Design a protein with these regions (language model features):
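Amphipathic alpha-helical polymerization modules
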Residues: 1-50, 96-173
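Extended alpha-helical coiled-coil "stalk/arm" regions
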Residues: 35-74
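Amphipathic alpha-helical assembly segments
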Residues: 61-121
């Protein structure tokens, strides 16, 4: 009877071990994809080529980030542009010509847009760091659980093998 119980336990532990190994492989892939995406965000600007080269698991997040970064940068630019334009007009006064004013206005808008994109990238990097820490913690828990299951599996196999030896008929001559 003990042989059956130990055999069932060994089978269950092998199943648990395979599930944990699958989770570890999935977590490792997620961490690798997130690090690749993090590198992409850290470079500053994302092009369509970068988007196409990003991991498929991060495509949705990349698209969401692009929309968020653009909208956030536009909002930042629209909020700060009038103040900067007014400061420039006060400094230059009547000395500027219309072409120079248009060029400066364009420069102000591009600069503020870039600052807004940088701010969005910083927010995304913080979010990515938190997600990476969460994944690393979950991976560590799974690795600990795998070690425990492996030890229990080893003990169950030894107990099963010992029970088989004890159950075997002993012939004496």
């Amino acid at each position: 009877m003990g042989i059956l119980i130990f055999s069932a336990r060994v089978s269950d532990l092998i199943h648990q071990k395979h599930q944990i190994e699958y989770k570890l492989a999935r977590l490792t892939r997620q961490m690798r994809d997130m690090q690749q995406y993090s590198t992409l965000i850290g470079n500053g600007s994302i092009s369509i080529g970068d988007l196409l080269n990003s991991p498929s698991s991060m495509m949705g997040r990349t698209m969401n980030y692009l929309g968020y970064a653009h909208n956030s940068a536009l909002q930042y630019m629209q909020a700060n542009a009038p103040m900067m334009q007014q400061m420039y007009a006060q400094q230059m006064g009547a000395q500027q010509n219309p072409q120079q004013a248009a060029m400066m206005n364009n420069y102000i808008m591009r600069t503020l847009y870039a600052q807004g994109r940088d701010r969005a990238a910083q927010v995304e990097m913080r979010n990515l760091k938190e997600a990476e820490e969460r994944l690393a913690q979950e991976k560590e828990q799974q690795e600990t659980l795998l070690a425990e299951v492996s030890e229990e599996l080893k003990a169950a196999k030894q107990a099963r093998d010992q029970d088989i030896k004890d159950f075997a008929p002993k012939y004496t001559a």
